[in-house]
Regions:
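Short, low-complexity intrinsically disordered segments enriched in A/P/G/S/L with frequent Arg
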Residues: 7-10
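Carbohydrate-interacting/catalytic domains
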Residues: 128, 137-151, 202, 512-653
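Substrate-binding/active-site clefts of carbohydrate-active enzymes
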Residues: 160-354, 373-383, 388, 393, ...
């Protein structure tokens, strides 16, 4: 991306030239140049108007009484503003490079009453009055957080269920297409469909739902690798104050959250601070050059994690990692710009307060300016002390992962992020499971040793139980394919996920054995949930629509998830693990309410496990109940472990 100032143009003329535009026809370039040359003349004659104010509203009684309004419209920055509303004070009015923007700093007293605040702007004989709403806070649940007591279900709303076909297509959007036969196009899933499936999730044992972003992505189709693709994934925001109308819009999202809460489920919102879509409304009339990270020529991030934490790293390597664009159509936001920072932070608070969401997942966490992230996290936690924040930092080692969360390491920068996505444990779980039933399972550092070693490094985190654990997601190969479509490994992996420390999260369709590799593209791991669309030939939301093998998997997940939900020891209990021996891996979860023993045989042969070695945790217990089979064990002297099986025992005295 290049920012250019055309000869003879006003210094306020901002022209975004994205990589695709560099190859536009000569005639189009001429028309563009002429329009830019005429802009200063048009600006002098235009009528001043205000077309947007963000945040669109605010609330009385927030812990932070201050809010900064972004006001946009032709000439909006040339007005002198006043506010005459009891309890609302205009502290400062700021202008920036582009005269179409003003930034108004307001302080809202706790005594202010809800109502319509008039933002009055004057310039010469012209006076404008823009209404802006101040609301009363309600007492509906919000910011409840997710904890180790929860089981999160991650789904892509476009691929989960379609409850309202009337919102599948809109002619006024840049991408008016919907075609389920094309894996790269939108498929029509929406919030109405998701709401209809809440009983399904409740029955499965899920306690929280995380959707990939639902905010507006009014992006055109983009050419990626020679194929035209839609922004169905949601990571290219074009307006942070509107839920995409193909999902149902703001009203549908608010209704969905309320219905989820009524069903006893929490809602996680997927946030993106690092970038926006290149057709975001602000980018069509940029406030200032420094709103984005700008380069002389298009510069993409290296996607390398090491320069951020490397004490020996060159500054240019750090800058490319952090300030390079993620892809050409997702411009990189400059969070060191205070106006950008305020805009993003206030939108985060607005979403929690307006929609009532409970937790905050942050996309591409490691690519953000980390002091900004600390400021944003602190602002959310100040308003909602119980809210949980967990970011995506796709790293390969524990030290780098700890850098982005509250940790015990003497880093020069200290993160205040409460949680994070545990990519290190995901890698360890998959590595261990792939070697189940092979000679490597009994090796020095093979099989369950991968898992043991990952958990053995938990000392670097202030609280590892706040990390979100998972086996796959929308960017990775599906779990079942990673483990060779092996149901024994599948059950062992889910057993580990739902009984070890952390906040377990499962990707949609795992419970019905959906599988695929990201080959040739990630669309293969984002297929529609069968039965989510009217007229689907199969309905996997029902037992009758599933195969016997799929029902076996579903019932297994349900039993394990229900046990996890109902037993505090798996939420708050301590973890003690024993070094794996001969492919046998044992750990305990324990607290004052009970003790659970998980014994895994990762070899391809049945094994007898003497338990004397585990006396530190098992002493005093004489019998047990097998959580997964219901079988009662009258003695704990030895355990019989079938091949490729994890046994979950509730110890009894």
């Amino acid at each position: 991306m290049v920012r250019r100032r055309e000869a003879g143009a006003s210094r306020y003329t901002q022209t975004l030239v994205f990589p695709p535009l560099l190859n536009c026809p000569r005639s189009m370039k001429i028309r563009l140049l002429l329009s830019l040359l005429l802009l200063p003349l048009l600006a002098t004659a235009q009528t001043i108007t205000i077309d947007r104010v963000n945040p669109t509203n605010w609330w009385v009684g927030m812990k932070n009484p201050n809010v900064q309004l972004l006001v946009h419209g032709p000439g909006a920055g040339t007005l002198a503003y006043t506010v005459n509303y009891p309890g609302v004070k205009l502290v400062k009015s700021s202008t920036v490079e582009n005269p179409n923007y003003a930034f108004l700093n307001l302080t809202i007293a706790p005594t202010a009453r809800p109502g319509k605040v008039q933002l009055v702007g004057k310039k010469g004989p012209q006076t404008l009055s823009q209404s802006w709403e101040l609301k009363a806070r309600d007492n509906t649940p919000k910011g409840q957080g997710v904890t180790a007591a929860d089981f999160i279900y991650l789904a892509m709303p476009d691929r989960f269920a379609n409850g309202d076909p009337s919102n599948d297509k809109f002619a006024d959007l840049r991408d008016p297409n919907m075609d389920r036969a094309n894996p790269f196009f939108r498929h029509g899933g929406d919030l109405a469909g998701a709401a209809q499936r809440l009983p399904y999730l409740k029955d499965l044992g899920v306690t929280a739902v995380w959707f990939t972003p639902v905010l507006e992505n009014n992006q055109p189709l983009t050419n990626e690798g020679g194929t035209m693709r839609a922004s169905y994934h949601g990571y290219g925001f074009t307006d942070q104050y509107n839920v995409d109308k193909r999902f149902g819009g703001n009203a549908a999202y608010k209704t969905y959250v309320q219905q989820a809460h009524a069903a006893g489920l929490k809602v996680v919102q997927d946030a993106v601070y690092n970038h926006v879509g290149n057709t975001h409304w602000i980018l069509q009339d940029l406030p200032m050059k420094s709103w984005l990270h700008q380069w002389p020529t298009y510069t993409q991030t290296s996607y390398k994690q090491q320069p951020i934490t490397d004490p020996h790293a060159a500054q240019i390597d750090k800058r490319v990692t952090l300030d390079g664009w993620f892809v050409p159509f997702l411009p990189d936001l400059n969070q060191q710009n205070p106006y950008v920072a305020n805009y993003l932070i206030e939108n985060a608070i607005w979403c929690v307060e307006n929609f009532g969401i409970d937790a905050w997942r942050i996309d591409t966490y490691m690519y953000n300016d980390q002091p900004f992230m600390n400021r944003c996290n602190a602002a959310l936690l100040a308003e909602y002390p119980r809210i949980h924040i967990f970011g995506e930092s796709s790293v390969t080692n524990v030290v780098d992962q700890a850098y982005y969360t509250r940790n015990k390491i003497d880093f020069p920068f200290k993160s205040n992020q409460p949680g994070g996505l545990d990519f290190v444990l995901e890698s360890a779980l998959l590595a261990g499971l792939k070697e189940v039933g092979t000679p490597a399972a009994t090796g020095w550092d093979g099989g369950p040793q991968h898992v043991y070693q990952a958990l053995a490094q938990d000392a670097v985190y202030q609280d590892p139980t706040k990390l979100v654990t998972f086996l796959d997601n929308h960017d990775h190969n599906r779990f079942l394919s990673e483990i060779g479509d092996d149901l024994d490994k599948y059950k062992m992996g889910l057993t580990w996920l739902l009984t070890t420390r952390g906040i377990p999260c499962m990707y949609y369709g795992t419970e019905i054995l959906m599988k695929n590799f990201k080959d040739p593209t990630d669309a293969e791991v984002r297929r529609d949930f069968p039965g989510g669309w009217p007229g689907d030939k199969e309905d996997k939301f029902t037992a009758a629509g599933r195969t016997a093998r799929e029902n076996e998997a579903f019932d297994f997940v349900k039993k394990l998830a229900t046990y996890h939900r109902d037993h505090k020891v798996l939420h708050d209990g301590k973890l003690m693990q024993y070094l794996p021996e001969n492919g046998l891996y044992v750990y305990f979860r324990y607290d004052a309410t009970g003790t659970v023993m998980v014994a895994s045989n990762t070899t391809d042969k049945a094994a007898t496990l003497p338990t004397a070695r585990f006396a530190e945790r098992a002493a005093g217990f004489t019998k047990a109940r097998n959580v997964l089979t219901g079988e009662s064990l009258g003695s704990l002297a030895t355990l019989q472990l079938p091949a490729k099986t994890a046994v979950v025992l509730e110890l009894l005295k």
